[in-house]
Structure formats: C-alpha cells, structure tokens
Design a protein with these regions (language model features):
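Histidine-centered catalytic micro-motifs
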Residues: 1-6, 42-49, 216, 234-237
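Amide-donor transfer/coupling interface in amidating biosynthetic enzymes
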Residues: 1-31
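Short, ordered loop/turn segments at secondary-structure junctions
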Residues: 10, 85, 174, 216, ...
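N-terminal hydrophobic targeting/anchoring segments and the immediately downstream early-domain regions
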Residues: 27-191, 244-255
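Histidine/acidic residue-rich metal-binding segments in metalloenzymes
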Residues: 153-163, 185-233, 246-256
Length: 256
C-alpha cells in the first residue's frame, strides 16, 4: 500500500498526516511481530476442529472453522494440537466401546486431512518435529485426546493411541469418569484420581504421553501432581484470578 499525504499536509490537512502516521506505526508493529514469529516456534495446544472433519472438509482450504492451514499461515502459527473429543456418557462397557470407536474415527479423519495436504503439513510427535517442519515450510499437527473416557478401562488402549500418534490425553471432560473427578461435576466420585486413574497416570508416564489437566477437579490436579513422575500440562485453562471458570486454575495451582 502506498499513501502520500505530503500534499494534503502541506495544504493544512493535519488529519490525513496523523492517519498516515497511524498506518506507519501499525506497519512497524506488524513487521516486528513477523520477525518474532520468524525466530520462535508457536503452538496452539487445543482445538476441537476435528469435529468438523466430514467428507467435504479440507483443512488446506479456507474453512469457517477457527483453524485451517490458510489461517495458520496468516497468523504465523507453526503447530496445532487437534483434539479428539468424546462426550462423557455412561461408564458401562457398551458406551465405553463407542467412545473408543469415536476416538479411532477422529484420528483417521486427522490423518486423512494431513494426507490430502501433505505438501503443506505433517503429523508431529516430538518438539523436534515442530522445528523441523517449520524449516521445511510445513505446519505441524499434533494429536490429543480430550476425555479419558475414550480409553475406557483398558490400559492397552493408551499404548494403541500412543502408537497412532497421540501425545497428550485430557483425563476428563465436564463429568466425572472412571479415571478422575471433573471440575464441572457437582458431586465428587473419587475425590481426585480413582485407583484406575493412578494406573493411567503411571502408564502415560511410561509411554511419554503428556497428562492434560484442563477440566480436572482441583482434587484431581493435586493427586496427579502427587503421582506423576513427569510434568503436566493444562491445554486450555487460564487463571481464576482473571476470570472465574471451573476450568481455570487458582494461583496456588499455577505456582505448583
């Protein structure tokens, strides 16, 4: 864009001159932001975009979802976690198997999107993958599972999902499950982690899958910190002191 307000300013149009100065300042800020993003690695740790991955969807084109490859390029976003979300249902065998099938389906959809746009993106599993893909001019997609309901009561599912590329699991969603208590549920079932949940934490540690504590009750949060041998993440939570929400963390939790 070129704009020459000199004649207007000479003629006494100081408003145009101030507007030009405003544009110059904005351009300088944008240039500075671009330089920062050139030097750093940026990663968004949660989006539910895979829920929109139907047969007509193409993440390589401009879609109405919050995340797609054109928007990632415009926002200078290097990597994105795609969450395989499953709604909490009854903790019986029939419904648990449906949840597992749903996670499998969403993972297949993610791989299909990446295969359709292999020249622009790839599945990532490690921090080094993010750096490598940025160097190659590609965007990185990581896979997470939102709600441990999707692994049911079989620890072997954790290994299977790990082998499929899953690198974090959010232990629960808005209701208690067989693993732990949720921050959104009005009643406590386990007062933190269940006995099975402790096994889940141990197995995730063994495999190197990150434990995500967004949606976890505070009692669950402290239990996980007690039993986990690895650092944890909170993929889509903020500070309760700034905004009161059951998914957000107290100052004490943030300091931990």
């Amino acid at each position: 864009m070129q704009f020459h307000p000199e004649a207007l300013a000479t003629a006494g149009d100081s408003i145009s001159a101030r507007f030009f100065y405003f544009l110059v300042q904005k351009a300088a800020t944008y240039r500075h932001a671009k330089e920062i993003h050139r030097r750093i690695l940026s990663l968004d740790t949660h989006t539910d975009t895979p829920l929109d991955f139907d047969v007509s969807y193409n993440i390589g084109t401009r879609e109405k979802t919050q995340v797609c490859l054109p928007k990632m390029r415009e926002g200078k976003l290097d990597g994105q976690y795609l969450a395989c979300w499953v709604r909490q249902g009854p903790c019986d065998e029939e419904n648990s198997l449906k949840a597992i099938d749903r996670v499998d389906e969403l993972i297949r959809h993610i791989y299909r999107q990446v295969e359709m746009n292999g020249e622009q993106c790839a599945i990532a599993r490690t921090p080094d993958d993010l750096s490598r893909l940025k160097t190659e001019g590609k965007k990185a997609f990581y896979i997470g599972i939102e709600n441990g309901y999707g692994i049911s009561k079989d620890l072997k599912n954790i290994t299977r999902f790990h082998d499929a590329g899953v690198t974090y699991i959010t232990l629960c969603h808005t209701r208690n499950n067989d693993i732990c208590d949720s921050s959104s549920d009005t009643t406590a079932r386990w007062n933190g982690l269940s006995p099975y949940g402790r096994k889940v934490v141990k197995e995730m540690n063994r495999l190197g899958i990150m434990i995500d504590l967004s949606h976890a009750a505070e009692s669950t949060f402290w239990d996980v910190l007690k039993y986990s041998k690895a650092p944890v993440i909170v993929s889509h939570s903020s500070a309760s002191a700034i905004y009161r929400h059951d998914r957000n963390l107290t100052d004490e939790q943030l300091r931990a």
